[in-house]
Amino acid sequence: SDPNEMGDNLPTVNLGTGRTVLAVASSDYHDCAILDDKSVKCWGDGGTGVRNDLMPGGDLILGNGPGEMGDNLPAVNLGTGRTAKAIAVGGTSSCAILDNGSVKCWGGNSSGQLGQGNIISRGDTAEAGHEMGDGLPAVNLGKGRKAKAIATNGETVCAILDNGALKCWGDNAYGQLGLGATGNREIGRAHV
Protein backbone atom coordinates (compact mmCIF):
# COMPACT_ATOMS: atom_id res chain seq x y z
CA SER A 1 0.00 0.00 0.00
CA ASP A 2 0.97 3.62 -0.46
CA PRO A 3 2.80 4.98 2.62
CA ASN A 4 0.72 8.15 2.28
CA GLU A 5 -2.40 6.07 3.03
CA MET A 6 -1.14 5.05 6.47
CA GLY A 7 -0.82 6.86 9.80
CA ASP A 8 -3.24 9.76 10.24
CA ASN A 9 -4.42 9.20 6.64
CA LEU A 10 -5.73 5.70 7.41
CA PRO A 11 -9.37 5.98 8.51
CA THR A 12 -10.69 4.05 11.49
CA VAL A 13 -13.32 1.35 11.08
CA ASN A 14 -16.71 2.72 12.12
CA LEU A 15 -18.48 0.13 14.28
CA GLY A 16 -21.12 2.45 15.71
CA THR A 17 -21.57 5.70 17.57
CA GLY A 18 -19.48 5.73 20.73
CA ARG A 19 -18.40 2.09 20.32
CA THR A 20 -14.85 1.00 21.09
CA VAL A 21 -13.17 -2.33 20.37
CA LEU A 22 -12.02 -4.83 23.02
CA ALA A 23 -10.79 -7.57 20.66
CA VAL A 24 -10.54 -8.23 16.94
CA ALA A 25 -9.99 -11.29 14.75
CA SER A 26 -9.27 -11.29 11.03
CA SER A 27 -9.36 -13.84 8.21
CA ASP A 28 -8.85 -13.72 4.46
CA TYR A 29 -12.56 -13.08 3.97
CA HIS A 30 -13.99 -11.31 7.01
CA ASP A 31 -13.23 -9.61 10.31
CA CYS A 32 -15.06 -9.64 13.65
CA ALA A 33 -14.70 -7.39 16.68
CA ILE A 34 -15.93 -7.62 20.26
CA LEU A 35 -17.14 -4.17 21.24
CA ASP A 36 -17.12 -2.43 24.61
CA ASP A 37 -20.68 -3.64 25.26
CA LYS A 38 -19.45 -7.24 24.60
CA SER A 39 -21.48 -7.49 21.39
CA VAL A 40 -19.87 -8.86 18.21
CA LYS A 41 -19.91 -7.16 14.83
CA CYS A 42 -18.51 -8.84 11.71
CA TRP A 43 -17.96 -7.51 8.20
CA GLY A 44 -16.57 -8.81 4.93
CA ASP A 45 -17.59 -11.96 3.02
CA GLY A 46 -19.07 -14.93 4.89
CA GLY A 47 -18.89 -15.71 8.59
CA THR A 48 -20.70 -12.50 9.47
CA GLY A 49 -23.81 -14.20 10.85
CA VAL A 50 -26.04 -11.48 9.45
CA ARG A 51 -27.84 -10.86 6.18
CA ASN A 52 -27.18 -7.59 4.42
CA ASP A 53 -30.70 -6.31 3.76
CA LEU A 54 -29.27 -3.05 2.43
CA MET A 55 -28.37 -4.69 -0.88
CA PRO A 56 -30.80 -6.23 -3.39
CA GLY A 57 -31.08 -9.96 -2.76
CA GLY A 58 -29.46 -9.70 0.65
CA ASP A 59 -25.79 -9.57 -0.44
CA LEU A 60 -23.71 -11.39 2.17
CA ILE A 61 -20.74 -9.05 1.81
CA LEU A 62 -20.85 -6.30 4.43
CA GLY A 63 -18.61 -3.25 4.51
CA ASN A 64 -18.00 -2.83 0.80
CA GLY A 65 -20.84 -0.42 0.16
CA PRO A 66 -21.98 2.96 1.47
CA GLY A 67 -24.09 2.92 4.62
CA GLU A 68 -23.20 -0.64 5.63
CA MET A 69 -20.93 0.09 8.59
CA GLY A 70 -21.31 2.07 11.81
CA ASP A 71 -24.73 2.03 13.40
CA ASN A 72 -26.10 0.26 10.28
CA LEU A 73 -23.90 -2.80 10.84
CA PRO A 74 -25.95 -5.18 13.00
CA ALA A 75 -24.46 -7.09 15.89
CA VAL A 76 -24.27 -10.86 15.56
CA ASN A 77 -27.17 -12.49 17.40
CA LEU A 78 -25.47 -14.83 19.89
CA GLY A 79 -28.67 -15.66 21.77
CA THR A 80 -30.91 -14.04 24.35
CA GLY A 81 -28.77 -12.15 26.86
CA ARG A 82 -25.52 -13.65 25.54
CA THR A 83 -22.35 -11.63 25.01
CA ALA A 84 -18.86 -12.56 23.81
CA LYS A 85 -15.62 -12.98 25.76
CA ALA A 86 -13.40 -14.10 22.86
CA ILE A 87 -13.63 -14.36 19.08
CA ALA A 88 -11.79 -16.41 16.44
CA VAL A 89 -12.29 -16.27 12.68
CA GLY A 90 -10.85 -18.15 9.74
CA GLY A 91 -11.90 -18.60 6.13
CA THR A 92 -15.66 -18.09 6.10
CA SER A 93 -16.43 -19.23 9.65
CA SER A 94 -16.40 -17.57 13.06
CA CYS A 95 -16.47 -18.86 16.65
CA ALA A 96 -17.06 -16.99 19.89
CA ILE A 97 -16.66 -17.89 23.53
CA LEU A 98 -19.75 -16.52 25.22
CA ASP A 99 -20.08 -14.95 28.66
CA ASN A 100 -21.20 -18.32 30.09
CA GLY A 101 -18.12 -20.14 28.69
CA SER A 102 -20.01 -21.89 25.91
CA VAL A 103 -18.82 -21.77 22.28
CA LYS A 104 -20.95 -20.90 19.26
CA CYS A 105 -19.64 -21.15 15.69
CA TRP A 106 -21.28 -19.94 12.48
CA GLY A 107 -20.51 -19.48 8.78
CA GLY A 108 -19.05 -22.02 6.37
CA ASN A 109 -18.93 -25.63 7.57
CA SER A 110 -17.30 -27.72 4.84
CA SER A 111 -15.24 -29.74 7.35
CA GLY A 112 -17.52 -29.83 10.38
CA GLN A 113 -15.73 -26.84 11.93
CA LEU A 114 -18.97 -25.51 13.41
CA GLY A 115 -19.07 -28.53 15.75
CA GLN A 116 -22.69 -29.45 15.01
CA GLY A 117 -22.31 -33.02 13.77
CA ASN A 118 -22.75 -32.16 10.11
CA ILE A 119 -21.37 -30.01 7.31
CA ILE A 120 -24.35 -27.66 7.08
CA SER A 121 -23.32 -24.00 7.08
CA ARG A 122 -25.15 -21.68 9.50
CA GLY A 123 -25.72 -17.94 9.47
CA ASP A 124 -24.27 -17.46 6.01
CA THR A 125 -27.41 -17.30 3.88
CA ALA A 126 -30.37 -15.00 3.43
CA GLU A 127 -32.17 -17.21 5.96
CA ALA A 128 -29.44 -16.56 8.55
CA GLY A 129 -31.88 -15.09 11.07
CA HIS A 130 -33.37 -18.41 12.18
CA GLU A 131 -29.94 -20.08 12.21
CA MET A 132 -28.48 -17.62 14.69
CA GLY A 133 -29.30 -16.49 18.22
CA ASP A 134 -31.14 -19.04 20.31
CA GLY A 135 -31.46 -21.19 17.14
CA LEU A 136 -27.68 -21.67 16.97
CA PRO A 137 -26.66 -24.51 19.31
CA ALA A 138 -23.50 -24.26 21.38
CA VAL A 139 -20.69 -26.70 20.58
CA ASN A 140 -20.74 -29.71 22.92
CA LEU A 141 -17.44 -29.39 24.78
CA GLY A 142 -18.31 -32.12 27.29
CA LYS A 143 -20.44 -32.23 30.42
CA GLY A 144 -19.97 -29.03 32.42
CA ARG A 145 -16.97 -27.91 30.36
CA LYS A 146 -16.37 -24.28 29.46
CA ALA A 147 -13.91 -22.72 27.02
CA LYS A 148 -11.12 -20.35 28.10
CA ALA A 149 -9.52 -19.70 24.69
CA ILE A 150 -10.30 -20.51 21.06
CA ALA A 151 -8.46 -20.49 17.72
CA THR A 152 -9.36 -21.43 14.16
CA ASN A 153 -7.76 -21.51 10.74
CA GLY A 154 -11.19 -21.67 9.12
CA GLU A 155 -11.42 -25.45 8.74
CA THR A 156 -10.14 -26.61 12.15
CA VAL A 157 -11.12 -25.19 15.55
CA CYS A 158 -9.34 -25.76 18.87
CA ALA A 159 -10.54 -24.66 22.30
CA ILE A 160 -8.71 -24.67 25.63
CA LEU A 161 -11.15 -25.79 28.30
CA ASP A 162 -11.54 -24.68 31.89
CA ASN A 163 -9.72 -27.83 33.06
CA GLY A 164 -6.71 -27.10 30.82
CA ALA A 165 -7.59 -29.78 28.25
CA LEU A 166 -7.52 -29.02 24.54
CA LYS A 167 -10.31 -30.12 22.20
CA CYS A 168 -10.16 -29.72 18.42
CA TRP A 169 -12.69 -30.46 15.69
CA GLY A 170 -13.16 -30.00 11.94
CA ASP A 171 -10.65 -30.71 9.18
CA ASN A 172 -8.09 -33.41 9.97
CA ALA A 173 -6.58 -34.16 6.57
CA TYR A 174 -3.04 -33.78 7.94
CA GLY A 175 -3.65 -34.96 11.51
CA GLN A 176 -4.06 -31.40 12.80
CA LEU A 177 -6.65 -32.55 15.38
CA GLY A 178 -3.86 -34.45 17.16
CA LEU A 179 -5.82 -37.71 17.32
CA GLY A 180 -3.19 -40.02 15.85
CA ALA A 181 -5.23 -40.47 12.67
CA THR A 182 -6.67 -38.48 9.80
CA GLY A 183 -10.29 -37.88 8.83
CA ASN A 184 -12.55 -34.96 9.65
CA ARG A 185 -14.49 -34.82 12.91
CA GLU A 186 -17.96 -33.72 11.87
CA ILE A 187 -19.72 -35.16 14.89
CA GLY A 188 -21.69 -33.10 17.36
CA ARG A 189 -19.16 -33.37 20.14
CA ALA A 190 -15.59 -32.20 20.18
CA HIS A 191 -12.76 -34.73 20.47
CA VAL A 192 -9.48 -34.63 22.33
Language-model features, listed with the residues they occupy:
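Thr-biased low-complexity repeat/linker tracts and other Thr-enriched repetitive architectures
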Residues: 1-6, 12, 17-20, 35-39, ...
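Conserved core positions of repeat-based scaffolds
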Residues: 30-33, 42, 93-96, 105, ...
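Short loop/turn segments that connect beta-strands within the blades of beta-propeller domains
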Residues: 27-28, 36, 90-91, 99, ...
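Short glycine/serine- and acidic-residue-enriched loop/turn motifs that recur at repeat junctions
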Residues: 1-6, 41-70, 107-132, 170-189
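Conserved positions at the start
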Residues: 21, 28-31, 84, 91-94, ...
